[in-house]
């Protein structure tokens, strides 16, 4: 249970730091940090816990919630629309669509499926490690 709480607090701190940084970071760097850092924290602590399915469920639930709050926070900033326009001009050679509209269900679904897939893979890896030892 302590690893579950540690994971939730660590991921909350990550999204808190990203919220504090706000729009002072490149959009691609922010996207990569959002995708890599929370799953790395969750993955490392997943191998230490005994609550496999509970751990996976609560991590996905809370990381999705943190992601939602982070996006709502960014979109509420006064410079958000000009920031998106400037970032899209900078990324014109890369095929990325970023809009200033509210993010929707598809982003949360992608993030949930991404987290679920990674944690299921880690679950099976953990089972294989246990059976070999």
UniProtKB/Swiss-Prot annotation:
Coiled coil: none annotated. One of its GO terms (cellular component) is plasma membrane. It is a multi-pass membrane protein. Keywords: Cell membrane, Membrane, Transmembrane, Transmembrane helix. It comes from the Bacteria. Disulfide bonds: none annotated. It is found in: Cell membrane. The chain crosses the membrane at residues 3-23, 27-47, 55-75, 103-123. Accessory element involved in the expression of sarA and several virulence factors. Modulates SarA production and/or function in a strain-dependent manner. Affects the transcription of the accessory gene regulator (agr) and genes encoding virulence factors including alpha toxin (hla) and protein A (spa). This is Protein msa. It comes from Staphylococcus aureus (strain bovine RF122 / ET3-1). The gene is msa.
């Amino acid at each position: 249970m302590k690893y579950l709480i540690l994971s939730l607090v660590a991921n909350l701190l990550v999204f808190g730091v990203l919220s504090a940084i706000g729009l002072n970071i490149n959009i691609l760097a922010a996207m990569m940090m959002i995708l890599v850092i929370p799953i790395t924290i969750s993955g490392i602590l997943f191998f230490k816990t005994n609550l496999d399915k509970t751990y996976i469920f609560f991590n996905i639930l809370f990381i999705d919630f943190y992601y939602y709050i982070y996006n709502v926070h960014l979109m509420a900033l006064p410079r958000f629309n000009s920031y998106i326009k400037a970032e899209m001009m900078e990324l014109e050679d890369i095929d990325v669509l970023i809009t200033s509209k509210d993010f929707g269900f598809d982003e949360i679904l992608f993030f949930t499926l991404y987290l679920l897939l990674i944690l299921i893979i880690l679950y099976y890896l953990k089972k294989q490690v246990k059976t070999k030892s």
